């Protein structure tokens, strides 16, 4: 049976980590670079989840600034009128097609009268 040497595999693994740590503080030693890379990968994983929340919050804030009355009442009116648009679509509609958004706003008012 031939003896298997793992030198190439280990070197490739270490080089991959060192390449990912390029530009980091203490990126020349494998042990320090490995800690930094693992921490950065955790932060980027967390950030991908937070980005969804942050954008939803941003769209809601911007829609609230555009609307003449509260955003929550507007969404409630849309649901009552069975208009299914998510927050991103509503915000893009308000930016790109203002007349269409005004018609949508008028439609939400006319079908069921808004109770303020």
Swiss-Prot record:
InterPro entries: Ribosomal_bL20 (IPR005813), Ribosomal_protein_bL20_C (IPR035566). It is found in: Plastid, Chloroplast. GO terms for molecular function: rRNA binding; structural constituent of ribosome. GO terms for cellular component: chloroplast; ribonucleoprotein complex; ribosome. GO terms for biological process: ribosomal large subunit assembly; translation. It comes from the Eukaryota. Keywords: Chloroplast, Plastid, Ribonucleoprotein, Ribosomal protein, RNA-binding, rRNA-binding. Belongs to the bacterial ribosomal protein bL20 family. Binds directly to 23S ribosomal RNA and is necessary for the in vitro assembly process of the 50S ribosomal subunit. It is not involved in the protein synthesizing functions of that subunit. This is Large ribosomal subunit protein bL20c.
């Amino acid at each position: 049976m031939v003896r298997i040497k793992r030198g190439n595999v280990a070197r490739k693994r270490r080089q991959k980590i060192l390449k990912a740590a390029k530009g980091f503080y203490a990126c020349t030693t494998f042990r320090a670079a490995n800690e930094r890379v693992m921490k950065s990968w955790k932060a980027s994983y967390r950030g991908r989840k937070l980005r969804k929340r942050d954008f939803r919050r941003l769209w809601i804030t911007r829609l609230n600034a555009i609307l003449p009355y509260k955003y929550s009442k507007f969404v409630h009116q849309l649901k009552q009128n069975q208009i299914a648009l998510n927050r991103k679509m509503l915000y893009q509609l308000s930016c790109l097609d203002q007349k269409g958004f005004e018609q949508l706003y008028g439609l939400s008012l006319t079908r069921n009268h808004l109770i303020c």
